[in-house]
Structures are given as structure tokens and as C-alpha cells.
């Protein structure tokens, strides 16, 4: 079996409303669908979410690097030669989500060729993941209303509150209102997307002490090394690295330097192969992980479920899997369903991300 052709298809699907957080705002999913074809007729699929304000990638740059840089190197290789593929991808610096999509699409090819679900090939620990829902920048009362609605409609009982606003009282108030309205049995954690300084983050933790918050993700820029380390040392809850740890090397640096003591894994930027390496490092060091969301479509969310459910350590916490609900449509032929607060893996060969051809034709951006 050889790689015969690689496609990178730009497409755009609007969000029902703008998604706002400390590092930016998005109004539509300007993503790239990656498809890898083999000479045996197999097609592997993955989704690529550009995040220019986080990783420097754009829709155009992803299409270009996939088709002009990676495809010429990968065509003719056996998809099962995974280490050789990784060595070729590493030759080109940066471009994490382009590399991640190629890796996931190749795992999809391998699963289909072997007639086995990829979550089984990876580890097969469980068949579902609990879902965490992200709450964006809104007045506190509206945040509580949304959380209660998602708990009632989908059974979700874990919420990630986007923070990093000024004045700090906006986020402090939101934390208190959510805890009072949701009760003590609901998990709430924070993600500041580098919106605060280390001192501001410490102040927020002081003013929310006793609310039972479970984690604080990317409170400040990891470049504030001393402030970040001081925050980790004095915080009673884990400080999670996310944007600061896109690669295995970054994870090693942040953990060993004391800049983070928990790690967010995002398959969109690491693929399944590097995500496994990151998970193994964290397990060896006794560090908790969360499965994050790159504002993923259903295609991307299914990839996260596939990886997260494969291992005990990655399935302990609820994964960030509901962002696709903010989209007006999706490319997945068989939509994901959240039932009793969880999403199940697909018990089919590969990842199971069959694409609706009509919808792809409607939303693709590379044809007039």
C-alpha cells in the first residue's frame, strides 16, 4: 500500500454567533479538510483548524504547506511506515495543525486498511468520553443560563469558563454566579488564554478561593517564566499548559521548568502520534492531562474522542468536545451525538469520519 495523492481543501462554515476569548474572536470555521488517498483505493480524512493568533497558521498557508511541501515528500510512502513519515514531517518547522491532520488522516488509512477502529489500534481503553462545554465571554447571568441549558439538554456537567478579561471582577463574578447556580457537583475550570499577568491570575485565584475550581489553563504568557513558576508554586489547583505546549519538546520544557503542572493535549496540533508521546511523558511524570478543543468541527471532535477514549489517562477528565454545536452546519455525514454528557467512538474501521460530499461541495472555497 502506497500514498498516491493528498488533497487540502479549504472550506468555510459560519458560526451561529461569534466566539470571543482573550486571544481572539472567530466568526466562521475557515478550516482545511485533508484527504490522503492510497493506491489500494483507501481515503483517510482529517480536519485542520488554522489559528493564526496562536500558531501562525492560516487557511492559505496550510493548503500551501500540505500540497507543496509535505505531499511531494509523502507520496509513494507506505502509510504503515509511521516513523519515516514523522521524520519527514519534522524536517519542516512549525505548521503544527497541518502536520497533525496528515498524521490523523494516515491513522485513518491504517485503520481502514486493517479493518479496525483507530481507537482500538491506539489503546482501546473505553468507548466514550465525557464532554466539557466551553463558556465564552458573556455577562454572568447569561453564562449560567447557557450552562443550565447544556446540562439539561445534553447531560453535560463539566464547564470550561473562558476568562482573561479586565477588570478582573468580570471573571470573578462569573465564577461565583456559576458555582452558586450550578451547585457543588458540577466541575468548573478556567482558561485565560494568556489574558492576564501572573500577578492578576494570583489575584483571581485568591478571590475565587473556596469555589472548588478544578484547574486554571494558560493564565498568562509562558514567557513570563518567573511569574508563571511562582504562580504554579502557590496555586492550590493545577496550572494547565495549552498554547505554550504544542509539541513534545514544549511539554518537556514547561513541566521541567515549573511553568505548568498539567497539560492540555490537542490532537488537531499533535496528531495521534505525538499526542501519544506527550501522554506517555505526562503519565511517567505523574502529570494530569486534559483533552482540549481547537474550536473543532465534528470531524475534529471525533478525532479527539478517538484518541481520548483510547487511554485511561486521557479519558479521566471530560474532554472539550462541544464547540461544534456553535456551528451552523458541518461536513460529517453522520453527525455526532452527545448523550448523557458523553460522545461515543465510532465502531467502524478507521476514525469513522465519513464526509458528506454535497456539503463539502457547498462550503469549499477553492472552486468558483
Name these PLM-found stretches.
Residues 5, 37-113:
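Metal- or metallocofactor-binding catalytic centers and their adjacent structured scaffolds
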Residues 3, 34, 41, 70, ...:
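Conserved, mostly hydrophobic/aromatic
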Residues 70, 212, 223-240, 245-342, ...:
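Shared catalytic-loop signature of beta/alpha-barrel
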Residues 48, 133-135, 161-163, 190-194, ...:
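A cross-domain feature marking catalytic cores of carbohydrate-active enzymes
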Residues 93, 103-139:
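Glycine-rich, aromatic-flanked loop segments that form ligand/cofactor-binding clefts
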Residues 122-235:
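Metal-dependent enolase-superfamily TIM-barrel catalytic cores that perform enediolate-based chemistry
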Residues 1-45, 49-55, 326-329:
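Structured beta-strand/loop patches that form or line metal/cofactor-binding pockets in enzymes
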Residues 351-368:
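Extended hydrophobic packing segments that form well-structured cores
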Amino acid at each position: 500500500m502506497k500514498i498516491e495523492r493528498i488533497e487540502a481543501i479549504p472550506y468555510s462554515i459560519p458560526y451561529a454567533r461569534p466566539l470571543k476569548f482573550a486571544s481572539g474572536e472567530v466568526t466562521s470555521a475557515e478550516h482545511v479538510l485533508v484527504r490522503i488517498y492510497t493506491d489500494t483505493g483507501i481515503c483517510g480524512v482529517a480536519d485542520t483548524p488554522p489559528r493564526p493568533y496562536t500558531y501562525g497558521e492560516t487557511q492559505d498557508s496550510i493548503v500551501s504547506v500540505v500540497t507543496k511541501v509535505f505531499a511531494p515528500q509523502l507520496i509513494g510512502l507506505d502509510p504503515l511506515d509511521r516513523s519515516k513519515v514523522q521524520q519527514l514531517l519534522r524536517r519542516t518547522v512549525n505548521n503544527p495543525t497541518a502536520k497533525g491532520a496528515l498524521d490523523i488522516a494516515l491513522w485513518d488509512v491504517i485503520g481502514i486498511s486493517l479493518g479496525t477502529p483507530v481507537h482500538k489500534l491506539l489503546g482501546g481503553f473505553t468507548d466514550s468520553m465525557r464532554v466539557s462545554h466551553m463558556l465564552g465571554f458573556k455577562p454572568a447571568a447569561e453564562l449560567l443560563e447557557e450552562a443550565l441549558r447544556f446540562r439539561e439538554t445534553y447531560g453535560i456537567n463539566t464547564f470550561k469558563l473562558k476568562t482573561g478579561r479586565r477588570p478582573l471582577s468580570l471573571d470573578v463574578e462569573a465564577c461565583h454566579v456559576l458555582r452558586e447556580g450550578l451547585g457543588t457537583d458540577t466541575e468548573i475550570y478556567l482558561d485565560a488564554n494568556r489574558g492576564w499577568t501572573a500577578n492578576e491570575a494570583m489575584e483571581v485565584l485568591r478571590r475565587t478561593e473556596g469555589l472548588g475550581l478544578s484547574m486554571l489553563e494558560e493564565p498568562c504568557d509562558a514567557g513570563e517564566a518567573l511569574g508563571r513558576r511562582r504562580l504554579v508554586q502557590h496555586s492550590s489547583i493545577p496550572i494547565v499548559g495549552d498554547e505554550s505546549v504544542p509539541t513534545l519538546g514544549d511539554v518537556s520544557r514547561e513541566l521541567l521548568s515549573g511553568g505548568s503542572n498539567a497539560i492540555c493535549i490537542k490532537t488537531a496540533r499533535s496528531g495521534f502520534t505525538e499526542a501519544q508521546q506527550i501522554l506517555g511523558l505526562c503519565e511517567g511524570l505523574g502529570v494530569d492531562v486534559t483533552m482540549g478543543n481547537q474550536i473543532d468541527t465534528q470531524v475534529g471532535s471525533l478525532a479527539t474522542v478517538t484518541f481520548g477514549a483510547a487511554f485511561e489517562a486521557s479519558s479521566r477528565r471530560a474532554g472539550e468536545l462541544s464547540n461544534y454545536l456553535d456551528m451552523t452546519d458541518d461536513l460529517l455525514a453522520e453527525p455526532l451525538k452527545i448523550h448523557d454528557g458523553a460522545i461515543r467512538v465510532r465502531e467502524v474501521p478507521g476514525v469513522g469520519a465519513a464526509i458528506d460530499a454535497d456539503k463539502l461541495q457547498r462550503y469549499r472555497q477553492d472552486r468558483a
